[in-house]
Amino acid sequence: NANEFEAWKHAVSWAIDNVGNFDNFISLPCTAPLRTKSSVFQCFETFGQKNPFVVSVTKTKYNPFFNLVRRDKQDSSINLLSPSKITRRQDAPEIFCITPIAYIAKQEEIIQRKNFWDGKIVGVEVSSDIATDIDDLNDFLFAEAVITNQNNKCLKDVN
């Protein structure tokens, strides 16, 4: 069971050995079916500004300083993941979640890193409307409903 970054390393190494050297690596996971061309182009533009590793991110409504908790296994008590004196969500630092719209990196960044976080990564903010990451059945059903609704709108425009 390899993690995604290890799979990228393997794919890049295999491609170099079997196809030849190349400059850039991009991953567009199928778990982000709501991605748009413009969101991918936005990542490419940021990558083109001499950023060797770019990933898409979106603002999250969850925050380790305010509403993410850890539950004790013995007594079910809860505590903040990152204890703080913040009492209002508006005062909490802005937090982003990586979303699989696009991952773009120089080939050597993938090969040389020991793990995903071993070096600088630039986050490109994308809208939460397209940031669905299908991890479970509910995510799938949500994405399916959005796509069906978009298709119905397109059909109305054609008629």
For the regions a protein language model found, what residue spans apply to each?
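Hydrophobic helical membrane-anchoring modules
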Residues: G123-E125, D129-N159
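Short acidic donor-binding loop at the edge of a beta-strand
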Residues: I16-I26
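Conserved core of the sugar-phosphate nucleotidyltransferase
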Residues: N1-H10, N24, P33-V126
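Short amphipathic alpha-helix with an adjacent loop that forms part of the alpha/beta core around
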Residues: K9-D17
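Active-site catalytic microenvironments for nucleophilic, acid-base chemistry
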Residues: W14, T46, V146-N149
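Helix-loop-strand module that forms the ligand-binding subsite of alpha/beta enzymes
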Residues: C30
